[in-house]
């Protein structure tokens, strides 16, 4: 089963223009769903992504990518 990433295109702390290429590099076969994820509170302060239906957040994008690597299905 492939990995799934869900990101918000409206949250202030998430820059989808830089995040999407990094996610594609982690798993080129993953599904990427871009829309409101109803995670607005944390999304104002931290960069976040849902990875396989689990929220992953970090103060910046580089830290987020490191956390996402640990959540990926092999």
UniProtKB/Swiss-Prot annotation:
Family classification: Belongs to the UPF0741 family.
HAMAP family xrefs: UPF0741
Pfam families named among the record's database cross-references: DUF1450
InterPro entries on file: DUF1450, UPF0741
Originating organism: Halalkalibacterium halodurans (strain ATCC BAA-125 / DSM 18197 / FERM 7344 / JCM 9153 / C-125) (Bacillus halodurans)
Protein name (record): UPF0741 protein BH3821
């Amino acid at each position: 089963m492939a990995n799934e990433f869900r990101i918000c295109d409206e949250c202030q702390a998430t820059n989808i223009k830089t995040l999407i290429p990094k996610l594609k590099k982690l798993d080129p076969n993953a599904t990427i769903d871009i829309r409101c994820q109803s995670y607005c509170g944390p999304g104002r302060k931290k960069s976040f992504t849902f990875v396989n239906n689990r929220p992953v957040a970090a103060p910046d994008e580089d830290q987020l990518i490191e956390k996402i690597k640990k959540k990926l299905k092999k």
